[in-house]
């Protein structure tokens, strides 16, 4: 018997350090082996007790009853656990059906189970927190899966971005054509205002959709809490089953130890009672038959318990596998949503910076244009009011987006059914950004038109200065002619006639030399006189200039 125990000892250690296939068996082998060895130990004890005295016979009669009591208690505990767990499953209804395929724990937890099942103690290498063993947090396959998903998303986004760019180019060309058909800038601004109103309506619709999505998120969070509660119940049932398995192992060990002690005692007794061996053979045979019957019963009970435990372990492993897969899928979806939100925030920041730069540029040009002409001041005031409205509405839009982003950060943990609708919202934000860029381009074109008009005004001012110089020259000539007329009146009529002819020829020559510059200056003065405040005064001076020498010549 001692030799057999020594052989069984290293066999157990070798099995615990065996191949991965044996590790996957988990607690099944740990629970099955002691139960199979227990009847053999009892049989050996029965054979050794046969030649004993009446006291040994009484002890034998009392011990099978105790063994039956222990086995009955263990079977009752198992039935209680099964009944409570089955009741929980029936009460859970359809909510637990998705959680029945929970995934199994990793290989480390399986090793800890086998270790605990064989020795009745937790493995020292793995820490226990709140009655559960910590699993390995970082798996090597998740990073590769994330990288492959990111590459697939980029490949899928490229054709979509190309299609979006083509659609945006067509919309911009249509908008530019409609703006070019309009003649006045007021009509262009009215068209832009209409398009901006359409954008506001679309934005309000998107806000309503965001509220609906938030409600759905709250429902998903409630479902997640329900699933966690069910998972905790399953973990409690598993802990109870593990405690039951440990009690069974302890019971089997106690049986083995008792069998070994009895074998030793009976070996000593055999040496003393070898003479009475032939008389007690009949009694021994009867006792052997009784023990065999009891052992067969115990074996059947152990086999039934082992089958039940195997079924329960398989169910737990399936459920744990399903739960691990669900959590990994949800983590990947959360990471994708976070990345998309960051991209949208960066795009919004860039649009704000561009808008501020363009606003400052337009304000500077407006100040300069106010100094140049009063008519452009009125148009610039209208543009400033519209820009103020745009900025206020854009700030409201930005505030709503910031609030929505805060709501998304609070509900980051599980987003299963929201990815499709979030993609639609991202498409709408890209459309909004494209339309904002088109409006900004239209404003830049207005600024370019303003610079062209400023250049035209400068050319007109140069022409007006030239006309003023001509008028001054004509006035000096008129004064000279008046002086000469006054001098000639005193000299005589004959001298006046001779002097007028050469003066008329010189005046006609001077007018012929200066007329090419005056003719082109007069045409733009007539057309562009309303654009500046100084034009009417110069025009009157130009009209009186060439008209005054006529009475002198007459």
From Swiss-Prot:
Example GO molecular function: syntaxin binding
Keyword Metal-binding: no
One biological process term in Gene Ontology: exocytosis
Alphabetically ordered keywords of this record: Coiled coil, Exocytosis, Phosphoprotein
Coiled-coil blocks: 186-491
Basic and acidic residues biased stretches: 143-158
Cysteines joined through disulfide linkages: none
Entry-linked Pfam families: Taxilin (PF09728)
GO cellular component labels: cytoplasm
Ranges of Low complexity composition bias in the record: 91-103
Superkingdom as given in the UniProt entry: Eukaryota
Residue numbers of Phosphoserine PTMs: 71, 515, 523
Phosphoprotein listed as a keyword: yes
Spans annotated as Disordered: 1-66, 85-166, 492-554
Assembly notes: Binds to the C-terminal coiled coil region of syntaxin family members STX1A, STX3A and STX4A, but not when these proteins are complexed with SNAP25, VAMP2 or STXBP1, suggesting that it interacts with syntaxins that do not form the SNARE complex.
Function as written in the Swiss-Prot or TrEMBL entry: May be involved in intracellular vesicle traffic and potentially in calcium-dependent exocytosis in neuroendocrine cells.
Family according to the record: Belongs to the taxilin family.
Protein name per the record: Alpha-taxilin
Organism listed in the record: Mus musculus (Mouse)
Gene behind this protein: Txlna
